[in-house]
Amino acid sequence: MASSFRIIQSMGPLFLGMSLLFIGNGLVIASCSALLKQNGVGELAIGLINTGFFIGALISTITAHRVISTTGHIRAFAIFSAIFAVSAMLHAISENLIFWAILRAFLGYCYYALLMVIESWLNAKIPNKIRSRVIAFYECVFYTSFGLGILILALDLSAFEIFIISAAFIMLSSIPLNLIRINQPQIPQRQPINIPKIFGIVPLALVGALVAGLAINGFFSMASLFVLLQGYSAKEASFFMTIAMAGGFLAQTFIGGFSDKYGRRPALLLCSVVSLISAVLFLLNGSNLIVQYVLSFFFGGGIFCTYGLSLARANDEITDKTKSVQVARALLFSYSFASLFSPLLMSYAMKIFGAFGFIYVYLVLYVGLILFALTQKTIPQHMRKEYNDRLVARTAGIATIQQNGNFADRENKK
């Protein structure tokens, strides 16, 4: 315990910087759909603009590592945070939808690149024996900070104020990193990913990663629109999203032990059933806001655990450890690729079916995942690795794609 505290203390500036970054990102991401809806933009157009974020993110996973390798982690963080902040501020000068879509792409590119910097630093710095405790602290920082960013929406700010405040947090995030000296890890060249081959090795994990990409990033980008279309304000939307994140965070403290004892497949089924039941109750409940707050807690608990359980399932199924990195990268890529379609899919459903088209998408996703999981076998307990859902289950989980080849073995989860 003392050792993990010393590591966290020594990396205090890094944790402070990432906290400021997550607050700024939470605000700028959650505000997009709300601001566009207030300006009278249609659901499909909102989905297209939000898709820009994930297009930028996918491009970032292909090219950003070159910038980091060339400039070093501290300078790369400064570069990407500056572009991130400027892109956030530029939203305030025009309401042109194409301009906003381009800016969202820049935001996605820079945010994923910044996570790549942060997480490679953590992986290089943290000793194996205390890794889970330090990364648990990192995850706490993420959920708390991102949730605070979303809650800022409840202050009834103007669009100009939202973008200035988010940019201020993002720009401030680079300052603490200039106060530390740390050996900067190397980021190697990318290697090709063979998705069909990976599906043959870890089918349930790959399907779970695809569902998680659609579900998690669809929630972050479109949940506020779901609440607004019911006639509520951005304040209620921010509470709805924050409660769901709290449910996701608390569920992860329980699901690890459950999946270690009973298996990843039963755990995936449990989370899928919880998500599905919550979705059905959303439809039966109608628009009662208090009930939706309660349901969002369980809804978040189900969807936010999907990706971590998929990773754990893959780790259990891999018999050839030389394939662990390739499998991990394939899952992360699948998660990211699915994210591209989540805003568009949900916005189209809401255009056709109204606000609850958002829920219909989750019904289809988790019915499909449940049916597929039922065709798979549970891995015997003696073959399971210790569950550790860290550094992956977040909006930009694919930031770890570019980590060095020892990442999977050090994490003992890929």
Regions found by a protein language model. Name each.
Residues 105-140:
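Cytoplasmic helix-loop-helix junction between adjacent transmembrane helices
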Residues 113-126, 304-319:
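Intracellular juxtamembrane helix-capping segments at the cytosolic ends
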